[in-house]
């Protein structure tokens, strides 16, 4: 019998940080979901995300938080910020475009000036956060660690 498979303390010590990371990754989505139900239900992008896309991100980031907790936390909070920024920016852009719209713009509203640009803004912001984190993790963080080691010696 392998001792590490039956060691209760070892299991508990490994399980607790993983649960904390999963809860921390879910926290911004729970807050956004509740805020959407209470205040933002009339806004297009919040309502669209509430209809099922929050759930997909929750599941993915919970699974990711087991192996890559820092990446999952950065992705979760970056995604929440991107959703909020994209929604308000998309609504403001659409209202501005309504003021300058011509009758032809109303005919082709799904692809023209009157389309809601929140999904594209969200995708760009989300991938910007991911790329910046990957660049930080691969380039900047090792340099910081090396500098700390040199100063400590």
Tell what function each PLM region has:
Residues 26-36, 78-92:
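Aromatic-anchored segments of alpha-helical transmembrane domains
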Residues 1-8, 145-153:
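Short, charged juxtamembrane terminal tails flanking transmembrane helices
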Residues 9-13, 17, 42, 46, ...:
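Juxtamembrane/transmembrane-helix boundary motifs in multi-pass membrane proteins
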Residues 25-28, 101-149:
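Alpha-helical membrane-associated segments of multi-pass integral membrane proteins
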Residues 38-50, 86-121:
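Interfacial non-cytosolic loop connecting adjacent transmembrane helices
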Residues 2-57:
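N-terminal signal-anchor transmembrane alpha-helix
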Residues 53-77:
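Canonical alpha-helical transmembrane segments
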Residues 70-84, 96-99:
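Membrane-helix interface/capping segments
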């Amino acid at each position: 019998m392998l001792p590490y498979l039956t060691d209760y303390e070892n299991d508990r010590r490994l399980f607790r940080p993983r649960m904390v990371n999963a809860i921390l990754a879910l926290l911004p989505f729970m807050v956004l979901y509740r805020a959407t139900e209470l205040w933002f239900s009339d806004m297009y992008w919040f309502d669209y995300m509430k209809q099922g896309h929050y759930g997909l991100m929750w599941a993915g980031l919970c699974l990711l938080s087991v192996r890559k907790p820092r990446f999952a936390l950065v992705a979760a909070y970056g995604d929440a910020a991107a959703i909020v920024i994209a929604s308000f920016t998309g609504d403001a852009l659409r209202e501005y475009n309504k003021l300058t719209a011509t009758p032809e713009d109303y005919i082709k509203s799904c692809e023209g000036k009157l389309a809601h640009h929140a999904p594209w803004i969200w995708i760009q912001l989300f991938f910007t956060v991911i790329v910046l984190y990957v660049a930080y993790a691969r380039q900047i963080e090792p340099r910081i660690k090396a500098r700390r080691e040199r100063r400590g010696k």
